[in-house]
Amino acid sequence: MGSSPPPYYADLGKKANDVFGKGYHFGVFKLDLKTKSESGVEFTSGITSNQESGKVFGSLSSKFAVKDYGLTFTEKWNTDNTLATDITIQDKIAAGLKVTLEGTFAPQTGSKTGKLKSSFANETVAINTNVDLDLAGPIVDVAAVLKYQGWLAGAHTQFDSQKAKFAKNNFAFGYQTGDFNLHTNVDNGKDFGGSIYQKVSDKLDCGVSMKWSAGSADTLFGVGAKFALDADASLHAKINNKSLIGLGYQQKLRPGVTLTLSAAIDGQNFNAGGHKVGVALELEP
């Protein structure tokens, strides 16, 4: 049995990012529903109400797979009245290769977009490309990650053909094992970041994150943790050097029903208010 492939560039540091991101829904009420028809069509719908702006956003998508041909068709719609279609073929052109054609259309404005995405991964390398199909000139994204004995090295570049210049030049280095991840990155030579993930025990996951920019004294540093109370409940907590505190509680009420409660507290201005709470309910078969 071969080793697992390296992560794609966008997924570097994902385990640490999940410690800081999953289990929190500050300032919103959210409902997600997933169902599957007898014919195999998967439906996903969601609605989010922003407490501050009062805006309600909803989305609906359907996904159908033709497994014999490696094809997946996805249709999407949202309350901004944007329609989207994705067609994906995987492992048929070549083993490990996935190609997706995406298109969006906004009827009220007539705006159309198209993207051609591809990704390939084996035990040593993970490569993905993203071409924005703009008639005025495509924007091309290319990223690659190499893996050697747990060590990771990645690069991401974006070329804007309309302006005939590179818009992004990013690099990342890291190391990962099953229960430990180290990630560092440099974006455009001026923005720096790093994260550490450690699975301390079967119940406790911890993360550390740091970001700063050249020429700026403003550094963002945070620590976070997830603790599993049991198989169906978990606690989440995080804090950064600006005294912003995040707390979350996630409970599986019954199979297919998960409730998440979260709160964001401004520790520097505790008495001034402005704290945020959030509630999310996920339903799936």
Task: Map each language-model feature to its residues.
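Outer membrane beta-barrel transmembrane domains
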Residues: 183, 195-197, 203-265, 269-271
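Residues that define the transmembrane beta-barrel architecture of outer-membrane proteins
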Residues: 27, 54-58, 79-83, 110-114, ...
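Tandem-repeat/low-complexity and Cys-motif detector
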Residues: 104-108, 119, 131-134, 144-145, ...
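Transmembrane beta-barrel domains of Gram-negative outer membranes and organellar outer membranes
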Residues: 1-141, 148-150, 156-159, 179
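Detector for outer-membrane/organellar transmembrane beta-barrel domains
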Residues: 145-228
